[in-house]
Amino acid sequence: MFYSIKNSEILKIRNDIFLHNAVPYLKQNGFVESPFLDANFGKNNRQLYIYEMCRLENSNLEFLTTYISLRDRYIQIRLNIFELFTKPKNISKLENINGIKFYLPPNSQKEERLDIDMLKTIPLFSYRFWFENYKLKSFHTKFGLNMAIRKLKYLIERDMKNINSFVEKWRQFHKTNITDWEGNIIELNNP
């Protein structure tokens, strides 16, 4: 009676949306695959895709980490920014360095999801929180699935084209921690 597809197919749809509607625009905006030794870019296991991308702006290392899981219908894109001391000449200087400390506390405490974090109001009153999150919405027909896919593609593409606005928004909420190239804290800045 109702149209349904397997969770593995939904995972593949969301992964394809990210690869075709996000990655090209992120690359246009200067993001590259993370150069660190332990970086992920693709399938982590049967139930999870992880994409780690970053760019170097002056001495700031801007991380975008994307999680696409079988367990939910979201494309979770997270942003975190660090000030590196000393400034590398280019991002390739970070190759063959272990970057795991960028993902551990206290560094991870300033990581924000692009779709539902960094709201200027409480989530209950936020249009973006309820209607513009990166979720493949529920559907009951093939037409409904196609509409949900089209909407998710539109949101992802629109926001990845304008990724710099999210970087500016992140800066309104946080100050960058100063770290070395491996993510060791030199100066912890709050908030």
Each language-model region and where it sits:
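Intrinsically disordered, low-complexity regulatory regions enriched in serine/threonine/proline
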Residues: M1-N21, E33-P191
